[in-house]
A protein has these predicted regions:
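N-terminal functional module of multi-domain proteins
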Residues: 14-135
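N-terminal low-complexity or simple alpha-helical regulatory segments
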Residues: 2-20
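Intrinsically disordered, low-complexity regions enriched in acidic/Ser/Thr/Pro/Gln residues
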Residues: 115-164
Length: 164
């Protein structure tokens, strides 16, 4: 998406997706409208998700795009829900250029009704987790090990001393 600014309103466009920012001059109010229909159709065309899963995943896509649009960073926002219901995992990633991707992993044996709620989908036994990862482009995802292993039994101790 690219951003164009005109006065108190700016818009971002990617294909047919739009992000519209607005500010009221006489009030301390600002906001955004987002339409990610084009990207969303791409996501759901690749998987046969149940209606309830599409709804929650769509809300996550919109939330990730809005969050990324409001932060000034070079990297990506990753939103993950690890569920203990019929939906095991939902992941949405939006980078600083507002490029999106999303997926869900479902329990293959579960039957999901069209009107299932978020707790029914993702938090059936109270062990669901929601995680937001703020990843900058310049931070390496894995730090290289700088310690040497002399003996099989002392590698942990050696790494603890030298890699702190």
């Amino acid at each position: 998406m690219t951003t164009e600014t005109t006065g108190a309103v700016s818009a971002a466009v990617s294909g047919q997706d739009t992000l519209q920012k607005f500010i009221f001059d006489n009030a301390a109010v600002r906001g955004q409208f987002i339409d990610v229909s084009h990207t969303w159709q791409e996501v759901v065309s690749r998987h046969a998700y149940p209606t309830a899963v599409k709804k929650v995943l769509g809300e996550m896509v919109a939330a990730a795009a809005l969050l990324s649009a409001n932060l000034k960073f070079n990297g990506s926002i990753i939103m993950q829900i690890h569920g203990d219901g019929p939906v095991r995992l939902m992941v949405v990633e939006c980078d600083s250029d507002l490029r999106l991707r999303a997926t869900a992993k479902l329990d293959p044996d579960a039957t999901i009704p069209d009107v299932a709620t978020v707790p029914q989908l993702l938090n059936a036994t109270g062990k669901g987790r929601f995680i937001i990862i703020y990843s900058t482009a310049h931070y390496p995802p894995i730090a290289p090990a700088t310690c040497r292993v002399r003996q099989p039994w002392d590698w942990r101790l050696s790494c603890l001393r030298r890699c702190r």
